Amino acid sequence: MAIPSRLRRTTDQREALLRDLVTDLIINDRITTTEAKAKSVQRVADKMVTLAKKGTLAARRQAAETVRLEDAGEGKDALQKLFSVIAPRYNDRTGGYTRIIKTVPRRGDAAPMAIIEFI
């Protein structure tokens, strides 16, 4: 098993970054970020969808530890959208809920960029 990237941050900073990116992915269905961050977000996002597919109260509480309470429009927050909109899409799928598409390097520092989105 590969060692996850530390993204040059302390543990608290890295966890906060991943929470923000996963929440943004749930709200917008697609985000643009660096390749390293996209790979880290993919692991967490797939785990959140798997929890949401279970649909239990315990799964909802576990997902609430990671997903921030931000407005996702339509009178729902990100956690509600995860459980009521995103999870039902993947009832027949056992994994691989997201894809990473590489894009052109970022202007300025030439960092490799990628788009991560729900399939």
Swiss-Prot record:
Belongs to the bacterial ribosomal protein bL17 family. GO terms for molecular function: structural constituent of ribosome. It comes from the Bacteria. PROSITE patterns: RIBOSOMAL_L17 (PS01167). It comes from Acholeplasma laidlawii (strain PG-8A). Keywords: Ribonucleoprotein, Ribosomal protein. This is Large ribosomal subunit protein bL17. HAMAP family: Ribosomal_bL17. GO terms for cellular component: cytosolic large ribosomal subunit.
